[in-house]
């Protein structure tokens, strides 16, 4: 048999799969963390990300791991995000089983703010501004707007949950499985701070690869998830 004498089979390449067929992720967005420290990592982000993270610092946000009994708080954020963005949330039992199964190989991160502590921190920052600087009035007004926003918060709790992220760790990779945030708290820039915190935690575990996981594989600017992940 001489393959050269056979008629050429005609194949057509239909392109790579886009979207999330059957809920599966075809495209991954990965950042290499090797050779970074906390300072150089932050500098590696784009200007929009750095600005948002600095704003989160101004608000004195706290990022911490949720306790098992706080999983409903975590789930509520994901649920609200799903309603807003059009995806279906898991049930509470899913999160609890995942928490129990992965143990310290999973971080259920919550970003929150204590309004009064945040106001106190802003007061200190405002008092330390250089009044002789050309940017003084602009900087002062920006911090004052943050104070006004904090004062307007109507919360019965001393700490207000803003956003969350679930990070899964293996020996070689950290994966940002999913996350969410409350739309009314977007000014806090909590999702940006969560990603920075998660990457620092990844480096502390001596893991060099951070997987943002799914993107649609559509690069015409219409994929909002990709645009967010490209900030880092």
Residue ranges and their predicted role:
Residues 6-187, 201, 218:
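A conserved beta-strand-loop-helix scaffold within acyl/acetyltransferase catalytic domains
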Residues 160, 188-191, 208, 222:
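Active-site-proximal structural scaffolding
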Residues 214-232:
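C-terminal catalytic domain of photolyase/cryptochrome flavoproteins
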Residues 185-197:
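Conserved acetyl-CoA pyrophosphate-binding loop and the N-cap/start of the following alpha-helix
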Residues 198-199, 203, 207, 230:
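Hydrophobic alpha-helix feature that most strongly marks membrane-spanning transmembrane helices
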Residues 1-5, 203-214:
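Conserved GNAT acetyl-CoA-binding A-motif
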Residues 69, 190-193, 224-227:
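Generic recognition of stable, solvent-exposed alpha-helical segments in well-folded globular domains
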């Amino acid at each position: 048999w001489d393959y050269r004498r056979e008629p050429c089979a005609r194949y057509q390449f239909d392109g790579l799969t886009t979207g999330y067929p059957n809920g599966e992720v075809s495209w991954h967005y990965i950042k290499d963390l090797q050779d970074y420290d906390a300072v150089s990592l932050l500098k590696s982000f784009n200007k929009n990300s750095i600005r948002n993270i600095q704003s989160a610092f101004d608000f004195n946000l706290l990022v911490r791991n949720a306790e098992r009994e706080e999983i409903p708080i975590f789930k509520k954020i994901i649920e609200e995000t799903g309603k807003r963005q059009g995806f279906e949330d898991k049930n509470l039992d899913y999160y609890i089983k995942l928490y129990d199964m992965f143990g310290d190989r999973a971080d259920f991160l919550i970003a929150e703010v204590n309004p009064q502590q945040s106001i106190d921190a802003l007061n200190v920052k405002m008092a330390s501004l250089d009044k002789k600087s050309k940017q003084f009035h602009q900087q002062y007004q920006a911090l004052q707007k943050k104070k006004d926003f904090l004062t307007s918060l109507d919360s019965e709790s001393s700490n207000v949950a803003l956003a969350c992220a679930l990070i899964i760790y293996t020996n070689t990779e950290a994966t940002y499985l999913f996350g969410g945030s409350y739309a009314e708290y977007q000014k806090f820039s909590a999702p940006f701070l969560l990603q920075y915190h998660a990457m620092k935690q990844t480096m502390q575990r001596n893991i060099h690869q951070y997987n943002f996981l799914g993107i649609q594989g559509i690069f015409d600017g219409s994929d909002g998830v990709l645009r967010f992940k490209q900030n880092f």
